[in-house]
């Protein structure tokens, strides 16, 4: 079987993505902490060039639960800190491990890692966070099913409020085209994805752009947000707080969303900035389900990439 990577949402077909999501649902039904032998005898590397809580823990726990050996490397804990070329690291890891999950700020470095002869998963890069967005889609469909609606995300209205130039927003833009839902990108001027990415999505009728938070949330089935200053933008924090003044997802914003709407945030949250406590902890929030679902979706994705089927 030719090796497959998961570097962006569109690295699967729609049918393949739904297959991964169905597998994740089956894995979630297993008792918490149950270990299997599906990947017994294998090792999966998790290489972290950026600080991480949820990504590291969800991959490390998930790999162990599948019966494989997690090998976690940070930049400072490896020869990467001394300038070893990423392609050399990739070639060596591929001799030891069966797959690599890579969290980096550089898409160029991600593509170099993907030269490895084993599957490579984008665990975050500067222009995408596909494992998070795929997990979020799982969370949305799970919430819909819990309310008795099993029609899925297709045709839904998903709003992303905040920094629409972020890796999260850009993966949502790709996801809208693959999963056939309507994405509303709502953010201040100057904080939008590259024009060519927006134009591609607009041609398929899958995106609306607005610079008004309440207009962005209007009629939305899902209201999604993220931090205003991501890792790497700390020096711009004060500038961004000023630019995003009035963009907090709160009761006033949510009053414009559909009555059945849910709220997502990939965490960590800066409470009182992009989202307030009342909304984050309120009945519409699916944030904690969303965090858990990273574990199940990533396990399913690893099984799929390695060609392992559930019995």
From Swiss-Prot:
Organism this protein belongs to: Sorangium cellulosum (strain So ce56)
Name this polypeptide is given: Ornithine carbamoyltransferase
Domain of life per record: Bacteria
GO cellular component, one term: cytoplasm
Main localization (coarse): cytoplasm
Keyword presence, Cytoplasm: yes
UniProt family annotation: Belongs to the aspartate/ornithine carbamoyltransferase superfamily. OTCase family.
Function as written in the Swiss-Prot or TrEMBL entry: Reversibly catalyzes the transfer of the carbamoyl group from carbamoyl phosphate (CP) to the N(epsilon) atom of ornithine (ORN) to produce L-citrulline.
Example GO BP: L-arginine biosynthetic process
EC number: 2.1.3.3
Gene that this polypeptide is encoded by: argF
Keyword Transmembrane helix (UniProt): no
GO MF term list: amino acid binding; ornithine carbamoyltransferase activity
Catalytic activity entry: carbamoyl phosphate + L-ornithine = L-citrulline + phosphate + H(+)
Pfam families, alphabetized: OTCace (PF00185), OTCace_N (PF02729)
Subcellular location: Cytoplasm
Enzyme class name: transferase
């Amino acid at each position: 079987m030719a090796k497959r990577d998961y570097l962006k949402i569109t690295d699967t077909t729609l049918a393949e993505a739904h297959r991964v999501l169905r597998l994740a649902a089956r894995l979630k039904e297993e008792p918490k902490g149950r270990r299997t032998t599906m990947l017994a005898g294998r090792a999966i590397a998790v290489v972290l060039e950026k600080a991480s809580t949820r990504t590291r823990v969800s991959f490390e726990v998930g790999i162990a639960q599948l019966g494989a050996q997690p090998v976690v490397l940070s930049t400072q804990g490896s020869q990467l800190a001394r300038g070893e070329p990423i392609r050399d690291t990739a070639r060596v890891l591929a001799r030891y491990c069966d797959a690599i999950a890579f969290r980096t700020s550089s898409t160029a470095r991600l593509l170099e890692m993907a030269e490895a002869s084993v599957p490579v998963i984008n665990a975050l890069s500067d222009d995408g966070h596909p494992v998070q967005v795929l997990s979020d889609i799982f969370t949305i469909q799970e919430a819909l099913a819990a309310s008795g609606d099993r029609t899925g995300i297709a045709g839904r209205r998903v709003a992303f409020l905040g920094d629409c130039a972020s890796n999260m927003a850009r993966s949502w833009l790709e996801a809208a085209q693959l999963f056939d839902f309507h994405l509303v990108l709502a953010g201040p001027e100057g904080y939008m994805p590259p024009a060519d990415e927006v134009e591609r999505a607009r041609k398929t009728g899958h995106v609306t752009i607005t610079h008004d938070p309440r207009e962005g949330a209007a009629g939305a089935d899902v209201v999604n947000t993220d931090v205003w200053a991501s890792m790497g933008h700390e020096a711009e924090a004060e500038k961004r707080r000023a630019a995003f003044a009035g963009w907090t997802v709160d009761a006033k914003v949510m009053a414009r969303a559909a009555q059945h709407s849910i709220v997502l945030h990939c965490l960590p949250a800066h409470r009182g900035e992009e989202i307030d406590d009342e909304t984050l902890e309120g009945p519409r929030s699916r944030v904690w389900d969303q965090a858990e679902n990273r574990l199940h979706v990533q396990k399913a994705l690893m099984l799929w990439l390695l060609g392992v089927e559930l019995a």
